[in-house]
Amino acid sequence: MQKVVKLNNIKIGNDLPFVLIAGPCQIEGKDHALFMAEKLVKLTSKLEIPFIYKSSFDKANRTSVNGIRGLGIEKGLEILSKVKSEFDCPIVTDVHSESQCTETAEIADILQIPAFLCRQTDLLQAAAKTGKIVKVKKGQFLAPWDMKNVQTKLEAFGVKDILFTERGACFGYNNLVSDMRSLAIIAELNVPVVFDATHSVQQPGGLGGSTGGERKYVELLAKAATAVGIAGMYMEVHQDPDNAPSDGPCMIKLDNLESILIKLKKYDKITKEK
């Protein structure tokens, strides 16, 4: 029987209708966060898709020292708290160091471990100590079966509810490729699997001082992942991605999200029909 992670009234499982995890790459300010959350909550409510809001208070792995990192943990968590209280939606955000975990867990329902840090034992242990759901993004450098080692660490630290995210694998220089077999392989660990459709089209360092991306392939990869069968779809969304402070080339435009989700719901239903 496939593992199901429960979060409030949301059930996350590979055999259940997919959950959408979405929001802008980084927290840009209170007004912008509330604007995005309102749009996403209304849309997912209309389409009857369970929704978790995602945004980052710090982009600690920017390509360049000049890259905009975000508002920081204090201001960022304050804004995420407003989103959570105003729209009654769960929150996921990333932590980059052990010192951030306890404070972040006061607001976030899910702690996300960035792909580059997925093997950092001390960070995994600190996240585990919070008692929150821990969502780990598979490193671009890891084979899908290597996530078993991450699972073993988390379970040793007492984590009961784990989510793993596929976000592509390094394919030569400045490029990622999505191996859809990875979704099935990770699911064999009996962990709900999330597909990150927007970071999977990244071109790391592809613009020299920043990361490039191929937004036009987001929908294609999202359809493929949904056809395989996933617990969650992760998408970074922005009303004006070309002018966003980070990951603009990868994020999808807010106005285009509804049509994509309608298609994904159809794929999801067919895949999970008994």
From Swiss-Prot:
**EC number of the protein:** 2.5.1.55
Pathway linked to the protein? Carbohydrate biosynthesis; 3-deoxy-D-manno-octulosonate biosynthesis; 3-deoxy-D-manno-octulosonate from D-ribulose 5-phosphate: step 2/3; Bacterial outer membrane biogenesis; lipopolysaccharide biosynthesis
List this protein's GO terms for biological process.
Answer: keto-3-deoxy-D-manno-octulosonic acid biosynthetic process
Can you state which reaction this protein catalyses? Answer: D-arabinose 5-phosphate + phosphoenolpyruvate + H2O = 3-deoxy-alpha-D-manno-2-octulosonate-8-phosphate + phosphate
* The UniProt record lists the keyword Cell membrane: no
HAMAP family, sorted:
KDO8P_synth
* Protein family according to the UniProt entry: Belongs to the KdsA family.
Record-given protein name? 2-dehydro-3-deoxyphosphooctonate aldolase
Species for this entry: Rickettsia felis (strain ATCC VR-1525 / URRWXCal2)
